[in-house]
Amino acid sequence: MTTVGLAVAAAAGAIGLGWWLTRHVRARWLPVLLTYFAYGASGVTAIALTFFQKDTLGLQPADVARIAFWLGLPWSMKMVVGVASDHYPLLGERRRPYLLLGAGLSIVGYALLASSVSTPSAYLAAMLLVTVGYMIQDVVADALSVELAADDRELKQIQALGRTFLLGGMIAAGGKLGGWLAGAFGSRPVFAMAIVLPAIVAVAGLFVRPQRTVQALPDSGPLAGHNAWIVMTAGLAYAAFGALLGLLAVARAQEIVLLVSAVLIGTLLWQVGVTRAVLVAAMVIFLFRATPSAGQGYTYWAIDGLGFDQDFLGWLAQVSAILSFVGLVVFRRTITERPVSFTLLWVTLAGAVLYLPNIGLFYGLHAWLGISARSLALIDATVSAPLAQLTMVPMLVLIARTAPRGAEATMFAIMASLMNLALSASELLTRYLNEHFAITQQDYSHLGQLMLVVLGASLLPLLALPVLQRAEADLERTHPPAGAVTDRRTGR
């Protein structure tokens, strides 16, 4: 698309969006909705980050997985930030200062990426600032979405609009636009442009009405009495512990942090009063989420070996973003009405089958079929993308059915931390595989073997399905389904 065409499309989109906003959105909701949009649109830097890691920093695939592990950990601390925002005001207010703090951290992180970052350690520090910033913004937006609603009807409206703005940001900025910007301007200018996103949140945050009343502590559950202080102290100690291990380059630091995280989350699950059946089901879903991937080694090879550039990778991301949303809409009802074990079975088997074209690309399947590598990659993305957003839905269904009365929000927060921890475990396993097969930018010869191992590993959790089915039978007796469940978020 030409520059003129992009300008015309942007102008038309802006006019249409403005008309729609005036009809459906109240002004006081905008800080929340713009926060969700900014988080969704933050994917605009994804392709720029890939080329920055590869070309500017010279990171090997195992190094990328090592960094991704640390970047996933802040999302397991959402509950701690939620407690802080609820019970420990900053500058006399409960929401606005935290929102501005989160936006400020992301702005500083992007500014460092755009200017001075030139080493892996500096890159990790800058990305942690960006990630922690978005995590804080996300927590505050979740809380504000409840506080701004005058009644249940308004709450449902805000939740639906939140999902719309989040997905709108992902689709609008996370694919073709991100690839085009990275190709046309380079990585650092894209990071500079991305500063606009948290800046929008900061400006919107100035219009949040002050919330000076400290929320009363609940009478039961993990936050009862003085337990909120314990959660805060433990969370801060955990963050300091992880940072210290990383800075001192302690051997097996990631494994130690993962183990400590699992113990902390397990303790919270025990305090909230989950049953054995729920715990078993959560552990099985954890196994499915923790399976390794090929990591950046495959993307690096596609760039070097197949000639995939920023623009084409942007197209793939755009197709995946749109069709993953379509898949969520089409399959959500089926998923929520069937047992979790059934959903995990068919999603896993389908995902394994649809992973085969990626392996085929490495071994020259496109040449054998007489089509270009880009055509096969685009076909594969089109077919497999609808499954991308489905793996978290079973956990949402499970939580909604089994959360102790009055502790639903706490249960969601703890389980979200557990699932984010599973993604960190996945990055750890990905690092192991890349190190074992010695995948580097100079040598991709063992990449095919790695991908075959990843395919096999994706099927291993199926062995735990009989255990999950027995747990589901217990849940059917103790927590009969009350209807379909929906959730307004599609990610962390």
Language model segments and positions:
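Transmembrane alpha-helix termini and helix-breaking/packing motifs in multi-pass membrane transporters
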Residues: V83-H87, A114-S115, M170-A192, L245-V250, ...
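Loop-to-transmembrane helix entry/capping segments in MFS-fold secondary transporters
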Residues: P61-A62, V146, A150-G162, Q310-D311, ...
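Helix-to-loop junctions at the C-terminal end of transmembrane segments
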Residues: M77-E93, A182, V326-W346, N434, ...
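A late C-terminal transmembrane helix in Major Facilitator Superfamily
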Residues: R405-F437
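Helix-loop boundary and gating motifs at the non-cytosolic
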Residues: A14-W75, G246, V250-A251, L279-L306, ...
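Intracellular loop-helix junctions on the cytosolic face of multi-pass helical membrane proteins
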Residues: T2-V25, V117, Q137, A150-A294, ...
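C-terminal transmembrane helical hairpin of 12-TM major facilitator-type secondary transporters
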Residues: F342-P394
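Glycine-rich segments within core transmembrane alpha-helices of 12-TM secondary carriers
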Residues: W75-K78, K156-G175, S320, A416-E427
